[in-house]
Amino acid sequence: EYQSKKIMADHGVTVQRFFVADSANDALEAAQRLKAKEIVLKAQILAGGRGKGVFNSGLKGGVHLTKDPKIVEQLAKQMIGYNLSTKQTPKDGVTVKKVMVAEALNISRETYFAILMDRACNGPVMVGSPQGGVDIEEVAVTSPELIFKEEIDIFEGIKDHQALQMAKNLGFKGPLQQQAADQIKKLYNLFLKIDATQVEVNPFGETPEGQVVCFDAKINFDDNAEFRQKEIFAMDDKSENEPIENEAAKYDLKYIGLDGNIACFVNGAGLAMATCDIISLNGGKPANFLDLGGGVKEAQVYQAFKLLTADPKVEAILVNIFGGIVNCAIIANGITRACRELELKVPLVVRLEGTNVHEAQRILNESGLPIMSANDLEDAAKKAVASVAKK
């Protein structure tokens, strides 16, 4: 949160005054420097639901309001260095290394505003709602008429009349309307300059003093822009990731751990999600989401198996590859090498389709290894689930 607020402030977007602290003493000094009527102290982790989270220090809640800087210090002592568990963190929570000490502003009205890339529109769109501070997905279901969407011409940007109309749709009145429109245009300039794919401000609110403020923001960046956004990508704190995720990233593998016992080894995020779904539909539980991506090499296949077999929860592995860019024969060679060198001890189900699939099937069939081949994804899922059930 503090990173997104700094980025916004650097681009002229109005945010509340704040400092970041990595010790209780620093938090106290920050609170004293703010000289605010009321202070909000927020634990800084890459997860939502902080307000209702619980620390292993015994403290409840990762967001606290107080008027006393000394209380800020006491609370920070129970936050920094302790794990905060929320609905979005692993069971053991995530270690809090920093806290944000900010001026607490009263919000007289909350709205929602976002700019994001929309494939259906082949470009950026503005999305807004006069109902902010709540889950926008819920608003879309219960009150779809309160969701306003406007396409943005990538060559001309947000025009003045578009920004004003969105401000009206969000319910801003009088001088606040122009103020909100100005903030909307600044957010779009930010969106472009930092190569964002999404800038979501919730709440995008107004104060009793007549100020439009971006109170909280979520920003997603285009990974392909890393070469020209080095400063932003350097902010990425990989220490909050599971160690296995960081290890996978070394080999250009995308890994997300899940709670089941059937490991998934797939190319492409969409196919990986579909594989997890079909395992679940057949009564199994996926142990992970592992996306091999395109341009794969045999060494990556070996490393992927090494990661999967290191997970003690894994009782079976399902390989599901649809070879377009990916050469199935390379996958097959990687699989056979991994099985031999790692002495695979769990059932392995393989479904291959696409480029060089016949050569791949020959490699697997002639390997002499106990590999179960599957005709399609449904067949693969059933075999993987059945292999676990036999244990």
Curated annotation (Swiss-Prot):
GO MF annotation list: ATP binding; GTP binding; metal ion binding; succinate-CoA ligase (GDP-forming) activity
Ranges for domain ATP-grasp: 5-233
An annotated GO cellular component: succinate-CoA ligase complex
Reactions catalysed according to its record: GTP + succinate + CoA = succinyl-CoA + GDP + phosphate
Site (Important for substrate specificity): 38, 106
Pathway it works in: Carbohydrate metabolism; tricarboxylic acid cycle; succinate from succinyl-CoA (ligase route): step 1/1
Pfam families: ATP-grasp_2, Ligase_CoA
The enzyme's E.C. designation: 6.2.1.4
Sequence positions that bind substrate: 267, 324-326
Its job: GTP-specific succinyl-CoA synthetase functions in the citric acid cycle (TCA), coupling the hydrolysis of succinyl-CoA to the synthesis of GTP and thus represents the only step of substrate-level phosphorylation in the TCA. The beta subunit provides nucleotide specificity of the enzyme and binds the substrate succinate, while the binding sites for coenzyme A and phosphate are found in the alpha subunit.
Complexes and interactors: Heterodimer of an alpha and a beta subunit. The beta subunit determines specificity for GTP.
Protein's recorded name: Succinate--CoA ligase [GDP-forming] subunit beta, mitochondrial
Lineage, uppermost ranks: Eukaryota, Metazoa, Chordata, Craniata, Vertebrata
Gene: SUCLG2
